[in-house]
């Protein structure tokens, strides 16, 4: 027997504030069981407008984070004329089966859509809501093409093998924290949120120079999933089965709203889905796909905040995303007007000017690509106060620049122990290079200049080891010396020519390294500011450490360590340069 009860959604405070308009109620159905094709039953909690009389569209969130955590969203949409279903994925919460991240949500999502569509309280139209993993769920469900899926609105959608569990084939220590969060059937929220514990364990692995594959043992949660992921260090068939193929993108026909942020940790994933649909989709389908890029971090793609990691944005950044979702669902499933905010198919926020701008497509932005060449005086670019230069002047025959990465150097760990609430403005790393890095600055901007889109960095480099990792970052350095992080990229040297085929480096050979995986950003760079390019080899407790031996990186330890001596060239025949998209 299913239990029913009525939830009084609005608080007494709201009731007193607006006594002329009684708070709407919703009806909740606890413990609905959704059958899947293999006999497993998923758990759902259903929220419906009180005393619903007519069938309505259904919105559902498919989550490994326990459906109850989305109560506020469910009641919001139920108060506004929708049935809302919070569905625990297979093996999580009160759902049956075993949870294997990213593996089953596509087929299971299809079955959920079709079951919801057949219920008497549904009018046959089903939509999805959610971000991060629940954004991934939307894309993997869509690739199965359930007939009654009317629209998806993926926010900060993770993309397997693009931004999680690795980025450009470099694993993050965070993955074991996330796997612990989603271990078993409960929420594990307090364990997940104990940052002190996780930093201590990541530091333990780092200080002892243990192989990355031992991380699950070090934290006390040995999982087969962690080891399985490490066995697939590139985007192979295992990962590719989880996301839409090029052929799938050609078949998409429903409206889509993609939401991400300048500082969304899953921006690479969200934009990969979007860009591949723009590349392979039909013209009619692309015309129904809208994109919003706000000045937000990961959580801000669902609940925007003015302050993000040391940056403060204007009130214009605070889009009411609940209301925007409602308008989108009204438009796509009820024949309502197009959402007010969506003035064109691409909406992006220009930080530094605090305005929203619109375009028909990313290509329609038509930026002027400004090429800035790297140079230095006397081969010295290894200090923030004695940096190299970025300029439009063609390179001359100058001495190359050099830096060194010793994977046994543990000094950076001491700088990474505290939580940093100002991560986007912090300059600790550029002030503490420890010989590991090169820095290049432009001249001061003579006028405020909008830079919007993707940058590209090309470096000609040689080294004396068969492999290492590179990290590149671009910042705005203001006239007062403070800085703002703009975008970043990472590369494992063995994958310099292909993310799926490794090719170890021949020591001493000069190779071209093209960094083209930077995140999208938009900023009005202030008059008097400079741009700073920072190149280094990552040496962080938060990342899989490359010990430079050329072996499988997850298996390397301090015993395999080799110091990398890296040379960057910027002469006429080997011009290293940065390309930035300037809006005229």
Spans of model-derived segments:
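C-terminal, loop-rich substrate-recognition/catalytic regions characterized by aromatic stacking residues
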Residues: 206-213, 307-584
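Short beta-strand/loop motif that positions the catalytic acidic residue
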Residues: 252, 258-260
């Amino acid at each position: 027997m299913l239990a029913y009860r009525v939830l009084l959604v609005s608080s007494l405070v709201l009731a007193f504030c607006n006594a002329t308009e009684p708070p709407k109620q919703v009806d909740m159905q606890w413990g609905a069981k959704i059958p899947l094709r293999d006999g497993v039953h998923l758990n759902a909690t259903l929220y419906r407008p009180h005393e619903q009389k007519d069938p309505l569209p259904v919105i559902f969130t498919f989550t490994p984070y326990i459906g109850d955590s989305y109560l506020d969203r469910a009641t919001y949409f139920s108060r506004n004329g929708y049935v809302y279903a919070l569905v625990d994925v297979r093996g999580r919460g009160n759902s049956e089966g075993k949870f294997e991240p990213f593996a089953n949500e596509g087929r299971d999502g299809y079955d959920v859509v079709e079951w919801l569509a057949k219920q008497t309280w549904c009018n046959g139209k089903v939509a999805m809501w959610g971000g991060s993993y629940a954004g991934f769920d939307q894309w993997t469900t869509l690739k199965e093409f359930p007939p009654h899926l009317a629209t998806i609105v993926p926010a900060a959608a993770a993309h397997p093998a693009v931004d999680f569990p690795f980025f450009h084939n470099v694993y993050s220590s965070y993955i074991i924290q996330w796997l612990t969060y989603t271990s078993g059937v409960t929420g594990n929220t307090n364990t997940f949120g104990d940052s002190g514990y996780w930093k201590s364990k990541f530091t333990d692995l780092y200080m002892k120079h243990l192989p990355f594959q031992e991380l699950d043992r070090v934290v006390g949660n040995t999982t087969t999933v962690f080891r399985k992921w490490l066995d697939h260090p590139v985007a192979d068939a295992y990962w590719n089965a989880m996301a839409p193929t090029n052929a799938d993108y050609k078949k998409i026909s429903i409206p889509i709203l993609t939401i991400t942020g300048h500082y969304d940790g899953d921006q690479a994933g969200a934009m990969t889905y979007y860009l591949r649909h723009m590349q392979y989709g039909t013209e009619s389908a692309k015309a129904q796909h809208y994109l919003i890029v706000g000045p937000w971090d990961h959580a801000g793609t669902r609940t925007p905040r003015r302050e993000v990691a040391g940056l403060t944005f204007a009130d214009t950044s605070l889009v009411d995303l609940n209301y925007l979702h409602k308008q989108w669902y009204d438009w796509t499933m009820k024949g309502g007007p197009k959402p007010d905010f969506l003035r064109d198919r691409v909406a992006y926020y220009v930080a530094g000017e605090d305005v929203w701008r619109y375009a028909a497509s990313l290509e329609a932005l038509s930026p002027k690509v400004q090429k800035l060449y790297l140079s230095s005086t006397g081969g010295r670019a290894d200090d923030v106060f004695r940096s190299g230069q970025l300029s439009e002047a063609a390179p001359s025959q100058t001495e190359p620049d050099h830096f060194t990465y010793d994977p046994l150097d543990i000094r950076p760990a001491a700088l990474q122990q505290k939580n940093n609430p100002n991560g986007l403005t912090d300059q600790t790393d550029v002030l503490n290079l420890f010989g590991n890095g090169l820095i290049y600055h432009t001249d001061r901007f003579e006028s405020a200049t909008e830079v919007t889109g993707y940058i590209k960095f090309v470096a000609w480099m040689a080294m004396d080891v068969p492999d290492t990792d590179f990290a590149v970052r671009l910042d705005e350095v203001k006239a007062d010396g403070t800085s703002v992080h703009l975008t970043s990229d990472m590369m494992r040297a063995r994958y310099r020519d292909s993310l799926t085929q490794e090719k170890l480096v021949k020591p001493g050979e000069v190779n071209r390294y093209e960094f083209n995986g930077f995140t999208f950003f938009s900023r009005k760079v202030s008059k008097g500011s400079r741009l700073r390019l920072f190149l280094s080899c990552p040496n962080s407790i938060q990342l899989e450490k490359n010990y430079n031996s050329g072996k499988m990186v997850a298996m390397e330890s301090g015993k395999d360590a080799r110091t990398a001596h890296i040379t960057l060239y910027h002469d006429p025949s080997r011009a290293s340069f940065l390309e930035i998209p300037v809006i005229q």
